[in-house]
From Swiss-Prot:
One annotated Gene Ontology cellular component of this protein: nucleus
InterPro entries: HAPR1 (IPR040308), HAPSTR1-like (IPR029196)
Organism phylogeny: Eukaryota, Metazoa, Chordata, Craniata, Vertebrata
Function statement: Together with HAPSTR1 plays a central regulatory role in the cellular response to molecular stressors, such as DNA damage, nutrient scarcity, and protein misfolding. Regulates these multiple stress response signaling pathways by stabilizing HAPSTR1, but also independently of HAPSTR1.
Keyword Nucleotide-binding: no
PANTHER family: HUWE1-ASSOCIATED PROTEIN MODIFYING STRESS RESPONSES 2, UPF0472 PROTEIN C16ORF72
UniProt-recorded Gene Ontology molecular function terms: ubiquitin protein ligase binding
Compartments it resides in: Nucleus
Protein name, UniProt field: HUWE1-associated protein modifying stress responses 2
């Protein structure tokens, strides 16, 4: 009855293993059986354990009797008898007891080592048959040593600073894109100076004047802003000659407007209105 559950368990665990694994398990199960010589010794030690003990006990009795006889003969020594024979008998009995005891101990030790090795292999195979495809090193060492594996340590947290959330980074990028950035016009002035246009651009202001400035300054500033914006939008579309003509036309327009202002002030109509 006990063999049937084992056979069923082996049949259930069979599909878990490959053909090579099944072959190895079969060889291991066959190797669990002792060799004929060891089987005889094991049978002699298992079935005839009492006989071995009785033999050692018999040798001990012989040794004890020989020692007692040696003591007895030494107390009542008869003339003509030598003490050598009782002493020799006692020494031989004790020596035989020592040899037989040593041989029995060696046989028991070798048999115990082999039985323990086979038992360990059998236990490991039974543990593997439980369906574990991967065996950790800690589990195997703890199983072979008969100890409980230590509890796993918690994973260490990285020491790097946490990344900002995506919403915060998007908001920061939007804020940076929305803020006005000052344009550095120093390279533009240097490029004009290299083309010999520094004198023409000297009268152009890149910034608007203060609130108390005159309308003429505001016009100059507005024309300067228009030209600077035009040049910033398409600086490569104009050549140096076209840029010079454009700047000169702006200067003529400013001068003609100033002349018209002066002429209107000296006109008779203006004087007549002032006299009235």
């Amino acid at each position: 009855m006990e063999d049937q559950p084992k056979d069923r368990e082996a049949e259930v665990a069979g599909p878990w293993f490959s053909k090579w694994e099944r072959q190895c398990l079969a060889e291991a199960e066959q190797a669990e059986q002792l060799s004929p010589e060891l089987q005889e010794e094991a049978a002699a030690d298992a079935a005839g354990l009492k006989i071995e003990r009785q033999r050692l006990w018999h040798l001990f009795q012989i040794s004890a009797t020989a020692v007692a006889q040696l003591y007895k003969d030494s107390g009542c020594q008869q003339p003509g008898l030598s003490m050598w024979d009782p002493f020799q008998n006692a020494a031989m009995a004790v020596t035989s007891l020592y040899k037989e005891s040593g041989d029995a101990y060696q046989r028991s030790f070798e048999l115990g080592v082999q039985v323990g090795y086979q038992r360990r292999v059998r236990d490991v195979l039974e543990w593997v048959k439980k369906g574990r495809s991967i065996i950790r090193r800690e589990d195997l060492i703890s199983f072979l040593c008969g100890k409980v594996p230590p509890t796993p340590q918690p994973p260490r947290t990285p020491r790097m600073s946490p990344r900002p959330p995506a919403a915060a980074s998007t908001q920061a990028a939007a804020t940076e894109s929305g803020t006005p950035v000052g344009v550095d016009l120093q390279p533009f002035h240097e490029a004009i100076a290299l083309h010999g246009l520094s004198g023409a651009m000297a009268s152009i202001s890149m910034r608007s004047g203060p609130p108390g400035s005159s309308s003429q300054d505001g016009g100059i500033a507005s024309s300067g802003r228009w030209k600077s914006s035009f040049l910033e939008n398409d600086p490569n579309s104009l050549s140096s000659e076209e840029l010079t003509l454009l700047l000169d036309s702006g200067g003529v327009r400013k001068r003609t407007s100033a002349q018209f202002g002066d002429g209107s002030a000296d006109s008779p109509l203006h004087k007549r209105n002032r006299m009235v």
